[in-house]
A protein has these predicted regions:
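Surface-exposed, charge/polar-rich loops and edge strands
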Residues: 1-409
Length: 409
């Protein structure tokens, strides 16, 4: 890595974003959004449906197939106080798929809204799920920073926790939309290829893709592969410290199949990433591979990518090629008879970071002074003001439901 970004001042990544430029709702047809093109320093625009024209045949495009869960649960106390319990990540069991299949009991790490009104006792809610009446209770456990361990119990063994979220939960939409969740968000705030439940926010770069765009990409000779990163609520956490050294990145869980890893190797360790979540996962793979090359006996816990890990690598480690790093992960899967890598990442990508795998990215327009803007700036070598000034001057819509960009540095 060339330089340590810890002393970057977040105020250098500010720009004026009028409220009317924030898209509160998506377009009625997903792929009719505008597409800003940044190619080797030049900026132009097109429609998202034209995306395949700008990617060479033989490219490998990687998508995040996570699915947003209806993670917000509302309870009303006997006093009338409304308490919101926002499920962040599974605790018992800590595997997402197993937790969703739990009957009668599940525990999650949650944020609690109106916590001061819930000092003791259990929250209760009567409901009907799949034609069956039941009572759901929520009990507060230990505190973890700004979150709490919450034990959920319900009195019907035929109903899973996934069933309860589906009926009782509300889809969490970004705070920047400044509105209530609507029924239409259940469809529009999911990508058309979402599969694996676990996110509390959508990987929004993927919202523009439709079956016809995906078909056009395949017809162009672009290979499409998937990985999973469950997006946490920390993605909306503002940077409050003057220097980014004071900002703690959230941990997010990732899963990458052997097939996707092998495709990346065939493509020389180069990929087009759809969204910043795919970017963070792909770049984390490089650092996981380097860890395994240095310590082949590393455990699953050892593979977690720490926030500043990329900037603390030796010169020898940074000379490792992407293919060598990916081959080390496949060898790890072979040793453990596994078909997928399951681990977590806390990586922060900021100016000074040297991209190893991602050669082009599709992404929306991000909040001022956000870690996602730092990620984009690192990718385009500091040229982000040119991109954002163009978008502001040419009527692009911003943030989660806004327009798209294809960045090729």
């Amino acid at each position: 890595m060339k330089e340590d970004p810890r002393h970057i001042r977040i105020s250098e990544f500010n720009y004026p974003l009028p409220d009317e430029r924030i898209a509160k709702f998506p377009l009625s047809v997903r792929d009719q959004s505008k597409l800003l093109l940044y190619r080797h320093g030049e900026v132009s625009e097109d429609r998202f449906t034209s995306l395949p024209e700008y990617l060479p045949s033989g490219s490998l495009m990687i998508f995040n197939n996570t699915k947003v869960i209806q993670a917000r649960l509302h309870f009303r106390k006997e006093t009338g106080a409304l308490i919101e319990v926002f499920c962040l990540e599974p605790i018992q069991p800590n595997d997402y798929a197993l937790n969703f299949q739990q009957t009668e009991h599940a525990a999650w790490l949650c944020m609690v809204g109106n916590l001061k009104k819930w000092k003791e006792g259990m929250l209760r809610r009567e409901m009907t799920v799949k034609g069956k009446s039941l009572t759901l209770t929520a009990e507060r456990g230990e505190c973890h920073g700004t979150s709490h361990w919450i034990n959920f119990r319900w009195n019907n063994p035929e109903v899973t926790f996934a069933d309860i979220l589906e009926v009782f939960g509300e889809l969490p939409i970004p705070p920047s939309l400044n509105r209530e969740t609507q029924e239409s968000d259940k469809e529009t705030y999911q990508t058309v290829y979402s599969k694996i439940k676990g996110s509390v926010a959508a990987p929004t770069a993927g919202l523009h893709f439709t079956p016809r765009v995906l078909d056009a990409l395949r017809n162009k000779g672009v290979e499409l592969e998937e990985l999973t990163l469950h997006v946490g609520a920390g993605t909306f956490k503002p940077v409050k410290s003057e220097e980014i050294e004071g900002h703690e990145m959230h941990t997010e869980y990732i899963s990458v199949s052997r097939n996707t890893l092998e495709k990346l190797i065939v493509h020389g360790g180069k990929a087009v990433a759809v969204g910043t979540t795919s970017v963070r996962t792909l770049e984390s793979l490089y650092h996981i591979g380097v860890t395994l090359l240095n310590n082949p006996e590393a455990t699953e816990e050892d593979l977690h990518v720490h926030q500043w890990q990329p900037y603390e690598m030796s010169a020898k480690a940074t000379a490792t090629s992407a293919v060598e790093a990916l081959q080390a992960i496949v060898a790890y899967l072979d040793r453990h008879s596994m078909e997928a890598l399951h681990t977590s990442t806390q990586i922060i990508i900021a100016p000074g970071y040297e991209y190893k795998i991602v050669k082009a990215m599709v992404t929306n327009f991000h909040q001022p002074q956000s870690t996602l803007l730092l990620l984009v700036s690192a990718f385009v070598h500091g040229d982000w003001p040119k991109i954002y000034n163009y978008a502001l001057a040419h009527d692009f819509r911003f943030l989660s439901y806004g327009d798209s960009s294809l960045l090729i540095p």
